[in-house]
A protein has these predicted regions:
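Short, small/acidic-rich helices and loops at N termini and domain boundaries
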Residues: 1-86
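Glycine-biased, small-residue-rich flexible motifs in mid-sequence functional cores and linkers
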Residues: 1-6, 84-181
Length: 181
């Protein structure tokens, strides 16, 4: 994984429990960059931005062992991190309100240059819902449209199955790291 030093600090900061996109970008705005957040984790001013429990988690994560373990786990899982600072961060994703600071990728991430369509739905969908998602995804895949969904049972699974039946590309997009599945 070839991340710049600044990207490594972005991955570190975005990995701290309790720091989602809103808090992440507020800290970056206040401190300038993720390395400065690391350097100022004990700053009293943090009280303005983070609740006590999150401040403690930030301080606990500010050590070389946590930092090393974070990247060792990614490497062990053959995953890579893509930050908003990375050249390969998806352009369209960067335009949404509060985009994820870091994406964790296993395999290819062809989101920028591929036509794609997201199919999402209930974990407890009906058989008709599963069938519709599977058939729709199969048709899209045959038209060279990448199918994007989560990894939950139900509609997500049916969408991926349909894309595979159609010999297409399927991309699982998670709201968490792949190690949390």
């Amino acid at each position: 994984m070839n991340l710049s030093t600044m990207e490594q600090y972005w991955v570190w900061l975005s990995s701290v429990e309790g720091i989602g996109p809103k808090r992440f970008y507020r800290l970056i705005s206040e401190y300038g960059d993720a390395r400065c957040v690391w350097d100022n984790a004990d700053d009293d001013k943090m009280k303005e931005f983070l609740p006590a429990a999150t401040r403690k988690k930030l301080r606990d994560a500010r050590n070389e062992q946590y930092f090393y373990t974070l990247f060792a786990r990614l490497e062990k899982c053959n995953m890579r991190a893509i930050t908003r600072l990375s050249d390969d961060y998806p352009e369209l994703l960067s335009r949404i309100y509060d985009p994820p600071a870091t994406l964790y990728v296993l395999g290819a991430c062809p989101l920028d240059n591929a036509r794609s369509f997201a199919i999402v739905g209930s974990r407890r969908c009906t058989r008709d819902g599963q069938r519709a998602a599977r058939e729709f995804a199969e048709v899209l895949a045959r038209e060279d449209v990448a199918v994007i969904s989560g990894m939950a049972n139900g509609v997500d699974t049916a969408a991926h199955e349909g894309a595979l039946i159609g010999y297409g590309r399927t991309i699982a997009l998670l709201g968490c790291g792949a190690d949390v599945i």
